[in-house]
Amino acid sequence: MDRFPADFADFLSPAGRRVLDGKLTLRAEPFLARPDLIAPAKAKAAFALLERVLGPVVKPLDRAIPPESILNQTRNYQERLPKTVRVRTADLDASRGKARDAARATGLETMLLSPSFRDFATALAGRKLTRGFGRQALRYGPGDYSGPHTDHHPEDPAAKDGYFDLHLSFVGGGATRQLLVYAKDGHLSETVDVAVPGLVSAYRLPFWHYTTPLEGKASAARWLILGTFYFA
Protein backbone atom coordinates (compact mmCIF):
# COMPACT_ATOMS: atom_id res chain seq x y z
CA MET A 1 0.00 0.00 0.00
CA ASP A 2 1.47 3.32 -1.09
CA ARG A 3 -1.34 5.52 0.21
CA PHE A 4 -4.09 5.45 2.79
CA PRO A 5 -7.58 5.29 1.27
CA ALA A 6 -9.13 8.70 0.66
CA ASP A 7 -12.29 7.65 2.53
CA PHE A 8 -11.84 6.28 6.05
CA ALA A 9 -14.83 3.99 5.48
CA ASP A 10 -12.72 2.07 2.94
CA PHE A 11 -10.18 1.35 5.69
CA LEU A 12 -12.73 -0.45 7.85
CA SER A 13 -13.71 -4.09 8.21
CA PRO A 14 -17.39 -5.11 7.98
CA ALA A 15 -17.56 -4.74 11.79
CA GLY A 16 -16.07 -1.26 11.48
CA ARG A 17 -18.64 -0.27 8.90
CA ARG A 18 -21.37 -1.29 11.33
CA VAL A 19 -20.04 1.38 13.69
CA LEU A 20 -20.95 3.95 11.04
CA ASP A 21 -24.48 2.54 11.20
CA GLY A 22 -24.64 3.28 14.93
CA LYS A 23 -24.21 -0.33 16.09
CA LEU A 24 -21.45 0.41 18.65
CA THR A 25 -20.94 3.25 21.12
CA LEU A 26 -19.14 4.00 24.38
CA ARG A 27 -22.45 4.55 26.19
CA ALA A 28 -21.65 4.90 29.91
CA GLU A 29 -18.13 3.45 29.72
CA PRO A 30 -15.11 5.80 29.57
CA PHE A 31 -13.02 3.46 27.41
CA LEU A 32 -13.49 0.96 24.60
CA ALA A 33 -10.96 -1.10 22.62
CA ARG A 34 -11.79 -3.26 19.59
CA PRO A 35 -9.33 -5.22 17.40
CA ASP A 36 -11.82 -6.03 14.62
CA LEU A 37 -12.87 -2.64 13.21
CA ILE A 38 -10.01 -2.12 10.71
CA ALA A 39 -9.39 -4.57 7.86
CA PRO A 40 -6.36 -6.69 8.97
CA ALA A 41 -4.47 -6.51 5.67
CA LYS A 42 -4.86 -2.73 5.59
CA ALA A 43 -3.70 -2.40 9.20
CA LYS A 44 -0.53 -4.36 8.36
CA ALA A 45 0.09 -2.25 5.26
CA ALA A 46 -0.52 0.95 7.23
CA PHE A 47 2.23 0.04 9.70
CA ALA A 48 4.74 -0.47 6.89
CA LEU A 49 3.74 2.80 5.24
CA LEU A 50 4.04 4.78 8.48
CA GLU A 51 7.44 3.26 9.24
CA ARG A 52 8.72 4.10 5.78
CA VAL A 53 7.43 7.65 5.37
CA LEU A 54 6.54 9.09 8.77
CA GLY A 55 9.15 7.18 10.78
CA PRO A 56 12.09 9.38 9.73
CA VAL A 57 10.34 12.63 10.73
CA VAL A 58 8.80 11.94 14.16
CA LYS A 59 10.62 13.74 16.98
CA PRO A 60 11.51 12.44 20.47
CA LEU A 61 9.38 13.48 23.43
CA ASP A 62 11.20 12.61 26.66
CA ARG A 63 9.93 13.74 30.08
CA ALA A 64 11.72 11.79 32.80
CA ILE A 65 10.87 11.62 36.49
CA PRO A 66 12.36 14.82 38.00
CA PRO A 67 14.92 14.13 40.76
CA GLU A 68 13.18 16.80 42.85
CA SER A 69 10.21 14.47 43.24
CA ILE A 70 12.36 12.63 45.81
CA LEU A 71 15.03 15.17 46.79
CA ASN A 72 12.50 17.85 47.74
CA GLN A 73 10.18 15.52 49.63
CA THR A 74 10.07 16.46 53.33
CA ARG A 75 7.19 14.33 54.61
CA ASN A 76 6.29 10.66 54.42
CA TYR A 77 3.75 9.68 51.74
CA GLN A 78 4.09 13.09 50.08
CA GLU A 79 4.91 11.70 46.64
CA ARG A 80 3.90 13.83 43.65
CA LEU A 81 4.51 12.47 40.15
CA PRO A 82 4.07 14.77 37.13
CA LYS A 83 3.28 13.20 33.78
CA THR A 84 6.27 11.29 32.43
CA VAL A 85 6.61 9.97 28.90
CA ARG A 86 9.06 8.63 26.34
CA VAL A 87 7.84 8.36 22.76
CA ARG A 88 8.36 9.89 19.32
CA THR A 89 5.68 12.24 18.07
CA ALA A 90 4.48 14.42 15.21
CA ASP A 91 1.87 17.18 15.26
CA LEU A 92 -0.21 16.58 12.15
CA ASP A 93 -1.97 19.92 12.62
CA ALA A 94 1.18 21.97 12.08
CA SER A 95 0.81 24.38 9.17
CA ARG A 96 4.12 23.24 7.72
CA GLY A 97 6.91 20.76 8.35
CA LYS A 98 8.15 17.34 7.33
CA ALA A 99 5.48 15.46 9.31
CA ARG A 100 2.66 17.39 7.65
CA ASP A 101 4.28 16.79 4.25
CA ALA A 102 4.51 13.06 5.01
CA ALA A 103 0.86 12.94 6.11
CA ARG A 104 -0.14 14.55 2.84
CA ALA A 105 2.14 12.36 0.72
CA THR A 106 0.75 9.14 2.21
CA GLY A 107 -2.88 10.22 2.01
CA LEU A 108 -3.16 10.06 5.81
CA GLU A 109 -4.29 13.69 6.02
CA THR A 110 -6.98 13.16 3.38
CA MET A 111 -8.28 10.04 5.14
CA LEU A 112 -8.44 11.72 8.55
CA LEU A 113 -10.29 14.68 7.05
CA SER A 114 -12.81 12.49 5.24
CA PRO A 115 -16.38 12.84 6.61
CA SER A 116 -16.51 9.15 7.52
CA PHE A 117 -13.66 9.52 10.04
CA ARG A 118 -15.58 12.15 11.96
CA ASP A 119 -18.80 10.13 11.56
CA PHE A 120 -16.99 7.09 12.98
CA ALA A 121 -15.80 9.10 16.00
CA THR A 122 -19.28 10.55 16.53
CA ALA A 123 -20.83 7.08 16.45
CA LEU A 124 -18.39 5.76 19.06
CA ALA A 125 -18.71 8.85 21.25
CA GLY A 126 -22.48 8.53 21.25
CA ARG A 127 -22.99 12.30 21.10
CA LYS A 128 -22.36 15.23 18.78
CA LEU A 129 -18.79 16.44 18.27
CA THR A 130 -17.46 19.76 17.06
CA ARG A 131 -16.45 19.95 13.43
CA GLY A 132 -12.78 20.75 14.00
CA PHE A 133 -10.45 18.30 15.74
CA GLY A 134 -6.78 17.73 16.53
CA ARG A 135 -4.53 15.15 14.87
CA GLN A 136 -1.30 13.63 16.12
CA ALA A 137 0.97 10.67 15.42
CA LEU A 138 2.96 8.77 18.07
CA ARG A 139 5.57 6.06 17.58
CA TYR A 140 6.41 3.83 20.53
CA GLY A 141 9.70 1.95 20.37
CA PRO A 142 11.08 -0.65 22.82
CA GLY A 143 10.65 0.60 26.39
CA ASP A 144 8.64 3.67 25.38
CA TYR A 145 5.69 4.45 27.63
CA SER A 146 3.33 7.10 28.97
CA GLY A 147 3.11 7.53 32.75
CA PRO A 148 -0.04 8.01 34.86
CA HIS A 149 -2.11 11.01 33.81
CA THR A 150 -5.72 12.11 33.38
CA ASP A 151 -5.75 14.28 30.22
CA HIS A 152 -7.84 16.78 32.18
CA HIS A 153 -7.61 20.36 30.86
CA PRO A 154 -9.61 22.58 33.25
CA GLU A 155 -8.07 25.77 31.81
CA ASP A 156 -9.35 24.99 28.30
CA PRO A 157 -13.00 26.10 28.02
CA ALA A 158 -13.73 23.60 25.25
CA ALA A 159 -12.20 20.64 27.12
CA LYS A 160 -12.80 21.41 30.80
CA ASP A 161 -15.99 19.32 30.92
CA GLY A 162 -14.46 16.40 29.02
CA TYR A 163 -13.68 15.47 25.44
CA PHE A 164 -13.25 12.44 23.16
CA ASP A 165 -10.13 10.75 21.79
CA LEU A 166 -10.06 8.21 18.95
CA HIS A 167 -6.87 6.13 18.58
CA LEU A 168 -5.86 3.91 15.65
CA SER A 169 -3.04 1.49 16.52
CA PHE A 170 -0.66 -0.11 14.00
CA VAL A 171 1.86 -2.64 15.31
CA GLY A 172 4.81 -4.47 13.77
CA GLY A 173 5.66 -8.11 14.28
CA GLY A 174 8.46 -7.35 16.75
CA ALA A 175 6.11 -6.01 19.43
CA THR A 176 4.72 -8.50 21.94
CA ARG A 177 2.85 -6.47 24.54
CA GLN A 178 1.95 -2.99 25.76
CA LEU A 179 -0.74 -2.54 28.37
CA LEU A 180 -3.10 0.35 28.87
CA VAL A 181 -3.94 0.50 32.57
CA TYR A 182 -6.94 2.59 33.53
CA ALA A 183 -9.00 3.44 36.58
CA LYS A 184 -12.32 1.93 37.57
CA ASP A 185 -14.08 2.68 40.85
CA GLY A 186 -11.11 4.76 41.96
CA HIS A 187 -8.42 2.14 41.36
CA LEU A 188 -5.96 1.56 38.51
CA SER A 189 -7.27 -1.97 38.14
CA GLU A 190 -8.27 -2.38 34.48
CA THR A 191 -5.87 -3.48 31.74
CA VAL A 192 -6.01 -4.07 28.01
CA ASP A 193 -3.20 -5.03 25.63
CA VAL A 194 -2.95 -2.25 23.05
CA ALA A 195 -0.06 -3.79 21.07
CA VAL A 196 -2.62 -5.31 18.71
CA PRO A 197 -2.55 -4.59 14.95
CA GLY A 198 -5.47 -2.46 13.86
CA LEU A 199 -6.77 -1.84 17.39
CA VAL A 200 -9.29 0.99 17.64
CA SER A 201 -9.54 2.68 21.05
CA ALA A 202 -12.08 5.27 22.14
CA TYR A 203 -11.68 7.44 25.24
CA ARG A 204 -14.17 9.68 27.00
CA LEU A 205 -11.71 11.82 28.95
CA PRO A 206 -10.62 12.69 31.58
CA PHE A 207 -9.79 9.62 33.65
CA TRP A 208 -6.62 8.17 35.16
CA HIS A 209 -4.63 5.89 32.86
CA TYR A 210 -1.11 5.02 31.74
CA THR A 211 0.65 2.94 29.08
CA THR A 212 3.32 0.43 30.08
CA PRO A 213 6.67 0.17 28.25
CA LEU A 214 6.41 -1.47 24.84
CA GLU A 215 7.77 -5.02 25.03
CA GLY A 216 9.33 -7.08 22.25
CA LYS A 217 12.34 -7.25 19.99
CA ALA A 218 14.76 -4.40 19.33
CA SER A 219 12.76 -3.71 16.17
CA ALA A 220 9.44 -3.44 18.05
CA ALA A 221 7.28 -0.46 17.14
CA ARG A 222 3.71 0.66 17.66
CA TRP A 223 2.16 3.58 15.81
CA LEU A 224 -0.76 5.53 17.19
CA ILE A 225 -2.81 7.92 15.07
CA LEU A 226 -4.94 10.16 17.28
CA GLY A 227 -7.98 12.29 16.67
CA THR A 228 -9.04 14.59 19.52
CA PHE A 229 -12.61 15.90 19.43
CA TYR A 230 -14.54 18.33 21.62
CA PHE A 231 -18.18 17.69 22.46
CA ALA A 232 -20.59 20.01 20.65
Residue spans for each PLM region:
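Non-heme Fe(II)/2-oxoglutarate
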Residues: 2-11, 17-119
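Short conserved micro-motifs at the rims of enzyme active sites and ligand-binding pockets
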Residues: 45, 213-214
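Catalytic core of non-heme Fe(II) oxygenases with the double-stranded beta-helix
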Residues: 100-210, 217-232
